[in-house]
């Protein structure tokens, strides 16, 4: 399988060269180990998926570091987080940079551990599945922000995405871009590995029930998070569902998009929206077995929206930026039948709010951006250019402050 160059590589190299310790987080099989082995060949490697390695790190840490000298890459470090105290001691006794690279698939858990043990000593980055830019070899690596300057710069490197539904269905895990990899077999193995290596260590749930839960969540990608509704489908308590959702979030399977809130928007809904990080995994769990059936299905709109949101998040993480405090959605409690009290995404940057609509349409209308004016109520922010990301062929202004963009502009 040929190595696909990852967009975040220059960011990681810069951070390794300037910090004593660098943490790379991301879901299983997004390519963390492959990237580190390919780009940081001088680092020794220890994998905490291996129980004997973990045991030595826990019980005989001095011997562990003698057997695994720096510069050292520790994979799946969350499986033995006690090692962080030893790493803290080592980095505090040295002025060297680039001593440790750590990786793991439990993002929030790891970030908590780092803040407790390695605060101020570690640089944190996130690796996601392949972006469309990476799949198509686009070198442009700025986060999506619908300014005139961004659109003009992005337009210079546009590549047409001819097989968009094939990629939505396939998903973004790098191994799937090996021409011989069977889609169903890959995801069957992925789910089994996820249950065995991650879930068994985090919850006391049988595999069948948790898989039923995964399927119920996948069927709701792009929807407001409703714990009670999922609990009814799975047959477990609502507190259990809340705990399990938090585990999916921690392990990079789902993302909870928070609502935009401001004192001027008193009627805004406060519930997060739930998105699967990978559309291929969501398709597998909900049994959409071909791209053609998915494209024509009742879930096509939600799956398309999930894909676009994921691509925007990737554009941030691939530039080394934290998107959690920039990207939101808005929905008012007085939502009407035409949906004119809802904005799919609100992107905030430098005191400007950019309303973004996501439409599975090749013929967008100006009315699709009708809710944008609600942001004018936020007096301490400006409203920026409104955007409709859709399946249109070329950039088209629908009115002076609203533009329809092909998804290739992400």
Label every model-predicted segment:
Residues 1-3, 8-9, 14-23, 27-29, ...:
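A cross-kingdom feature that marks ATP-driven nucleic-acid transaction machinery
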Residues 20, 69-71, 95-101:
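Loop/turn-to-beta-strand initiation segments
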Residues 43-71:
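Short glycine-rich substrate-engagement loop in P-loop NTPases that contacts/grips substrate
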Residues 67-83:
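Conserved P-loop NTPase "ATPase switch" module shared by AAA+ and STAND
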Residues 85-108, 115-117:
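Conserved catalytic/switch belt of AAA+ P-loop NTPases
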Residues 102-107, 113, 128-130, 390-392:
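A short beta-strand-to-loop transition that corresponds to the Sensor-1 phosphate-sensing loop
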Residues 108-124, 138-140:
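Short regulatory helix/loop adjacent to the ATP-binding pocket of P-loop NTPases
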Residues 137-303, 307-313, 317, 325-328:
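Interdomain hinge/linker elements that couple catalytic modules in large macromolecular machines
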């Amino acid at each position: 399988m040929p190595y696909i160059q990852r967009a975040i590589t220059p960011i990681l190299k810069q951070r390794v060269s300037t910090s004593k310790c660098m943490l790379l987080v991301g879901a299983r099989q997004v390519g963390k180990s492959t990237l580190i082995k390919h780009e940081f060949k001088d680092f020794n490697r220890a994998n905490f998926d291996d129980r004997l390695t973990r045991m030595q790190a826990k019980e005989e840490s001095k011997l562990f570091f003698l057997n695994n000298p720096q510069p050292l890459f520790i994979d799946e470090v969350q499986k033995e987080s006690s090692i962080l105290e030893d790493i803290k001691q080592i980095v505090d006794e040295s002025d060297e940079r680039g001593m440790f690279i750590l990786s793991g698939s439990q993002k929030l858990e790891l970030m908590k551990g780092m803040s407790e043990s390695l605060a101020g000593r570690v640089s944190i980055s996130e690796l996601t599945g392949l972006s469309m830019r990476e799949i198509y070899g686009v070198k442009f690596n700025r986060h999506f922000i619908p300014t005139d300057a961004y659109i003009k710069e992005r337009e210079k490197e546009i590549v047409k995405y001819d097989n968009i539904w094939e990629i939505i269905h396939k998903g973004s895990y790098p191994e799937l871009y090996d021409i011989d990899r069977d889609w169903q077999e890959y995801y069957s193995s992925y789910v089994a590995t996820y249950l065995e290596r991650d879930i068994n260590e985090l919850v006391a749930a049988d595999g069948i029930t948790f898989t039923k839960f995964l399927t119920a969540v996948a069927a709701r990608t792009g929807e407001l998070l409703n714990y009670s509704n999922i609990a009814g489908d799975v047959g477990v308590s609502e507190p259990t569902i809340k705990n399990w959702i938090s585990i999916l979030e921690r392990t990079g399977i789902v993302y909870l998009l928070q609502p935009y809130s401001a004192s001027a928007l008193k009627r805004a809904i406060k519930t997060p929206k739930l998105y699967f990080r990978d559309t291929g995994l969501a398709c597998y769990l909900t049994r959409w077995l071909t791209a053609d059936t998915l494209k024509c299905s009742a879930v096509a709109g939600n799956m398309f929206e999930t894909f676009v949101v994921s691509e925007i998040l990737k554009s941030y993480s691939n530039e080394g930026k934290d998107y959690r405090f920039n990207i939101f959605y808005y929905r008012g409690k007085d939502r009407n039948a035409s949906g004119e009290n809802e904005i799919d995404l609100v992107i905030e940057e430098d005191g400007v709010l950019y309303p973004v609509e996501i439409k599975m349409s090749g013929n967008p209308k100006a009315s699709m951006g009708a809710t944008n004016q609600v942001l004018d109520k936020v007096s301490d922010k400006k409203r920026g250019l409104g955007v409709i990301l859709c399946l249109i062929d070329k950039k088209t202004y629908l009115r002076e402050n609203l533009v329809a963009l092909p998804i290739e502009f992400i």
